[in-house]
Design a protein with these regions (language model features):
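Short beta-strands and strand-coil junctions in structured, solvent-facing domains, enriched
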Residues: 22, 30, 324-326, 347-348
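Surface-exposed helix-capping loop/turn segments at secondary-structure junctions
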Residues: 33-38, 268, 348-354
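Conserved, well-ordered alpha-helix/loop/beta-strand core segments that scaffold catalytic motifs
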Residues: 1-40
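A short acidic/glycine-rich loop-to-helix N-cap element
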Residues: 322-332
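Short, gly/Ser/Thr-rich active-site loops of penicillin-recognizing serine hydrolases
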Residues: 234-243, 332-375
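A helicase ATPase "motif cassette" and its flanking acidic/Ser/Thr-rich regulatory loops
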Residues: 24, 137, 338
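Beta-lactam-recognizing serine transpeptidase/beta-lactamase-like catalytic domain environment
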Residues: 1-3, 7, 16, 42-87, ...
Length: 375
């Protein structure tokens, strides 16, 4: 007899958008050709729903040619490869500073004379920025300014904020081989150990973790669980989906304001701009580590951004591994890739431009060369 009537399973659909996947693949290939990089990755999220819209890694492989498979090319670098995030983590340090009550984005910090001694280490800026606001500290990616903020609020508070944003933890996607990264946990914190996490050294993250963290800024301070399944409903029930309010909407709004300024004429990410839209983000350039310490001539170039600024929803992280020559900084190697990917993200998602006459990146760059694209 029949124990129970059969029930049809539910239909599922992946959140991956093949059009965006193609765009990422095309633009990463272009970036590798132009920079001579050894590898590249990108991931795009919908911050409101937690959907992973595209995720690309190069070098790639053809699964139909099994005799030519390169195991290194089969890695899903977005979830398996970890790196020091460098200056892309400074917006999280900004969160710690704002929550401390000691700083606002217009608080002044004296960065003179353009360098600061911490223990026996000298941390320099590209030049002496003098007395600048906290916002300008992030715009210029001032090591001196961020160091003074870190010393004022304490490394404990910064690490707690990193933990709230999911750094050092698995994202919950259950991707095979996903790594949790690492946060510093010293038995003894030297003077330099207390400040380096604030500007992204001494910790390890994956591109997906970094994108998930930036999604908090794009979603009014809420962290939504990531998913590879397309969300069936336009109205997302955040309480039911496991979303958590990890920072206040006001703090998130202030951080987005600063991220937008980073792409402005005085910031390090002028080449991240997108015609017809206001975007925000942060550059990062980190030295790679060899057997005997940091390497002087090998870098990872990073950019993490949100768009559009007036109603942020889409987050993209770009990682360019070992770019060669003079085009090795996050602002020069990774930011233009973000710009081209995000242009297509917003077009495909039918986001209406806010400018009737879009200003091209080249015209905007010609207007000002004040920013340092290497930060």
């Amino acid at each position: 007899g029949v124990v129970s009537e059969a029930a049809d399973g539910e239909s599922i659909q992946l959140s991956i958008d093949l059009r965006l996947q193609h765009v990422q693949h095309r633009e990463l290939l272009r970036a590798m050709r132009e920079t001579g990089a050894s590898a590249a990755s990108a991931v795009t999220l919908d911050a409101m729903t937690g959907e992973i819209l595209a995720m690309t890694n190069l070098p790639s492989f053809n699964p139909n040619r099994r005799g030519q498979l390169d195991l290194a090319a089969m890695r899903n670098r977005v979830v398996t490869d970890v790196f020091e995030p460098g200056s892309t983590v400074k917006p999280l340090t900004l969160v710690a500073a704002l929550e401390s009550g000691e700083f606002d984005i217009e608080t002044l910090i004296d960065t003179s004379p353009g360098r600061i001694m911490v223990g026996n280490k000298v941390l320099p800026d590209p030049r002496n920025y003098g007395e600048i606001t906290v916002s300008r500290v992030i715009e210029k990616s001032s090591q001196v300014g961020v160091t003074k903020m870190a010393q004022a609020i304490g490394h404990e508070h910064i690490i707690v904020v990193f933990q709230r944003f999911g750094l050092g933890q698995l994202t919950g996607t259950e991707f095979p081989g996903e790594r949790a990264g690492r946060l510093p946990d010293h038995d003894f914190w030297s003077a330099i150990d207390r400040v380096t996490p604030a500007f992204g050294y001494g910790l390890l993250v994956t591109p997906l973790q970094l994108a998930h963290a930036y999604a908090v800024f794009a979603n009014e301070g809420r962290m939504v669980p990531l998913t590879l399944l397309a969300q069936a409903f336009q109205e997302i029930d955040h309480s039911a989906s496991g979303a958590r309010q990890i920072i206040s909407p006001m703090v998130a709004e202030k951080v987005v304001t600063v991220l937008h300024r980073v792409t402005g004429p005085a910031g390090t990410a002028q080449r991240a701009t997108v015609s017809g839209f206001d975007v925000g983000g942060k550059t990062g350039t980190v030295h790679k580590v060899g057997r005997e310490g940091y390497l002087d001539d090998r870098y990872v170039a990073l950019f993490a951004g949100v768009a559009p600024v007036e109603s942020p929803r889409y987050v993209t992280v770009v990682v360019i591994d070992e770019p060669e020559g003079d085009v090795y900084g996050g602002g020069a190697a990774a930011a233009p890739v973000y710009s081209r990917i995000t242009q297509e993200v917003l077009r495909i998602q039918n986001v209406v431009p806010n400018s009737a006459e879009p200003v091209s990146n080249d015209r905007r760059l010609a207007a000002s060369r004040e920013g340092d694209s290497r930060a």
